[in-house]
Amino acid sequence: MADNYVQKSVSLYRDAKNNLYWLFPNNTIERGFYILGLPAKKFDAASTDCMTLIHETLDLMQYCRSVTYDDATQDLKARFKAEVKLWSGSPGLQKASSAVLTIYLTDNEFCIDVFSAKKEERGAYKYTIKRPLEASHEEFAEALNEAFEFYK
C-alpha cells in the first residue's frame, strides 16, 4: 500500500529553548512522526551549519523512500527512547521554535516552505524558496540560509 510509505518531506525546527535543530520525516497517515513525539535527528544549533543540515535532510529523505510507516516508527522508538520525553508532540516544539521549515522535493525542484514562528500566527505559511534539482548542495545550503534569514 503506497499510502503506508513515508513521503520525501522533512520538517526542520530550530528549537530556541534547547538550542537544537530537529529534523522529522513526514508521512501520509499522521502528517509527521512529530505527532508521536518521535524526532528523527537532532543537532546542536551552535555547531551545525546549513551544509550539514542539507546533507542530513537529503539523507533522511533517502531513508524515507524505502521505509514503511510501521518500520520507521519502530526504528525511531528504538533509537530515540530517551528523547521522546523531551517533546510529546509538535505543539510544544512549535511554541519553543524560532524557525519552522518544511523541506521537500518535487519532480524538478528542491523546495523549502517557511512558516511563521510567532505565537499569534500559529505556524502560518509565509513563502517558498525553490532551487532546481540540478543545483549543487552549496546552493541548497544557501537556500536554507536564506530561509533562516526570515527569522532574524
Predicted regions, residues:
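Residue-level detector of solvent-exposed, low-hydrophobicity positions
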Residues: 28-29, 87, 94, 147
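Negatively charged, low-complexity tracts enriched in Asp/Glu with abundant Ser/Thr
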Residues: 1-4, 44-99, 119-127
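Short, surface-exposed beta-edge/turn micro-motifs
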Residues: 9, 99-100
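Residue-level detector of alpha-helical secondary structure
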Residues: 58, 81, 141, 145-148
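Intrinsically disordered, low-complexity regulatory segments enriched in Ser/Thr/Pro
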Residues: 2, 7-51, 105-142, 150
